Swiss-Prot record:
Keywords noted in UniProt: ATP synthesis, CF(1), Chloroplast, Hydrogen ion transport, Ion transport, Membrane, Plastid, Thylakoid, Transit peptide, Transport
Record-level Gene Ontology MF annotations: proton-transporting ATP synthase activity, rotational mechanism
Family in the record: Belongs to the ATPase delta chain family.
Protein's UniProt name: ATP synthase delta chain, chloroplastic
Signal peptide feature range: none
SUPFAM superfamilies for the chain: N-terminal domain of the delta subunit of the F1F0-ATP synthase
Keyword Mitochondrion: no
Biological processes, Gene Ontology terms: photosynthetic electron transport in photosystem I; photosynthetic electron transport in photosystem II; proton motive force-driven ATP synthesis
Assembly and oligomerization: F-type ATPases have 2 components, CF(1) - the catalytic core - and CF(0) - the membrane proton channel. CF(1) has five subunits: alpha(3), beta(3), gamma(1), delta(1), epsilon(1). CF(0) has three main subunits: a, b and c.
Annotated organelle transit peptide span: 1-70
Cross-referenced Gene3D superfamilies: N-terminal domain of the delta subunit of the F1F0-ATP synthase
Phylogenetic lineage: Eukaryota, Viridiplantae, Streptophyta, Embryophyta, Tracheophyta
Gene designation: ATPD
Length: 257
């Protein structure tokens, strides 16, 4: 991770990444792995990847506050590079869709550890990436971007970079993200009403809804929005029961729900 500790090297690599995104990469074609994919979700079969990744020896970012700041800075630079290309080519929405697919893929621990493992060769990683690209239908510049992360040994930061891209995308498009948590899946009409409500409260140009299922709420739903979900609207039965318990001075009683 020497490059993370060398600002000059970091700037050089990031500049190269921005320039390289505008061109298609030429790569060798190593013998592909026989991996199982689901065409609907574009995810790996975790067992096959665990077999491929015998050792989870990953390149971890430098610890402590300094390490966190350096990781954040690096992620921001790469995410901004991808956003710049998407903005110039008029593919922001499509690129954000690519990023959402990649977030789901790399949230699978075996997938992430496979790519972050420095013991596994770049050719092998590219071979597996080719399958991801084909199955997920990624745009050429998004596919090229992930190849750049592999070549520049920044693939271990892919989660941070993808999350940072979402933040950059939201700022560019004036989008407010609202996380709606409910006991059961809400109908699209209900989600549309919630989106309108959040838009009215925040004044955002666009509102994007993310849904989470949490049976512990008993009934109703909660809405989190704002900077890192700092704002909360709690319409759950669980919250109402807690308020009733507080009014009856039953704070020390645990409600079985």
């Amino acid at each position: 991770m020497a490059a993370l500790q060398n600002p000059v090297a970091l700037q050089s690599r990031t500049t190269t990444a921005v320039a390289a995104l505008s061109t298609s990469s030429t790569t060798s074609t190593p013998k592909p792995f026989s991996l199982s994919f689901s065409s609907s979700t574009a995810t790996f079969n975790p067992l096959r990847l665990k077999i491929l990744t015998a050792s989870k020896l990953t390149a971890k970012p430098r610890g402590g506050a300094l390490g966190t700041r350096m990781v954040d800075s690096t992620a921001s630079r790469y995410a901004s590079a991808l956003a710049d290309v998407a903005d110039v080519t008029g593919t922001l929405e499509a690129t954000n869709s690519d990023v959402e697919k990649l977030i789901r893929i790399f949230s699978e621990e075996p997938v992430y550890y496979f790519f972050a493992n420095p013991v596994i060769s770049i050719d092998n990683k590219r071979s597996v990436l080719d399958e991801i690209i084909t199955t997920s239908g990624l745009q050429p510049h998004t596919a090229n971007f992930i190849n750049i992360l592999i070549d520049s040994e920044r693939i271990n930061l892919v989660k941070e970079i993808l999350n940072e891209f979402e933040d950059v995308f939201n700022k560019i498009t004036g989008t407010e993200v609202a996380v709606v948590t409910s006991v059961v899946k809400l109908e699209n009409d209900h989600l549309a009403q919630i989106a309108k409500g959040v838009q009215k409260i925040t004044g955002a140009k666009n509102v994007r809804i993310k849904t989470v299922i949490d049976p512990s709420l008993v009934a109703g739903f909660t809405i989190r929005y704002g900077n890192e979900g700092s704002k909360l609207v709690d319409m759950s039965v669980k919250k109402q029961l807690e308020e009733i318990a507080a009014q009856l001075e039953m704070d020390d009683v645990t409600l079985a729900v």
